[in-house]
């Protein structure tokens, strides 16, 4: 495959550090083909995340049939979870599904400290969004990683009790 050839041409790239995202809606067309392709990539050491989870029509089918290790909760649910009980229920349900299927879960669209706090209380430890960092050039990432500090309220959450 093309990916195998690229990895072979660049042995300095460890495929275990590569994660490809599959948009839930893009897998609708041919789940068998998508699954076969994902399995071929897994054989190379590449991992997968299901992106925008909850926005498609067959989310549970994807959890069962696609070999992903991570679910990314769509930002539309995360952003509204503090004001909308339905969005909160969806986020809570997706976190529960991830745990049931022994998958990692990451919340997209974490805009505020309160979003992060709520997610931690639900047992979701991974997040991305402007509340953590704005997009930045790759060259700025090392300095950001050295200087970033989680909010004290986030650090105060006992993750064993929250899960």
Predicted region positions:
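Short glycine/threonine-rich loop-to-helix capping motif typified by GTGT followed
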Residues: 1, 33-34
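Short, well-ordered amphipathic alpha-helices
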Residues: 1-8, 116
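Aromatic/hydrophobic pocket-lining residues that form π-stacking "cages" and hydrophobic walls in ligand
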Residues: 3, 37, 94
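Charged DNA-binding/catalytic regions of mobile-element recombinases
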Residues: 9, 43
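EAL-family c-di-GMP phosphodiesterase catalytic domain
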Residues: 17-31, 44-163
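Catalytic core of soluble alpha/beta enzymes
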Residues: 35-38, 42
């Amino acid at each position: 495959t093309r990916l195998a050839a690229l990895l072979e041409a660049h042995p300095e790239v460890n495929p275990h550090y590569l994660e490809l995202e599959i948009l839930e809606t893009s897998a609708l067309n041919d789940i068998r083909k998508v699954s076969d392709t994902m399995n071929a990539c897994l054989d190379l050491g590449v991992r997968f995340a299901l992106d925008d989870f909850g926005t498609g029509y067959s989310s549970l089918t994807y959890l069962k049939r696609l070999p992903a290790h991570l679910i990314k909760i769509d930002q539309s649910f995360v952003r509204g979870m503090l004001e909308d009980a339905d969005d909160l229920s969806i986020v809570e349900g997706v976190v529960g599904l991830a745990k049931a299927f022994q998958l990692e879960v990451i919340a997209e669209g974490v805009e505020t400290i309160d979003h992060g706090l709520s997610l931690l209380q639900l047992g979701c430890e991974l997040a991305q969004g402007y509340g953590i960092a704005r997009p930045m050039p790759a060259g700025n990432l090392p300095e950001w990683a050295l200087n970033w500090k989680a909010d004290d309220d986030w650090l105060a959450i006992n993750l064993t009790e929250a899960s």
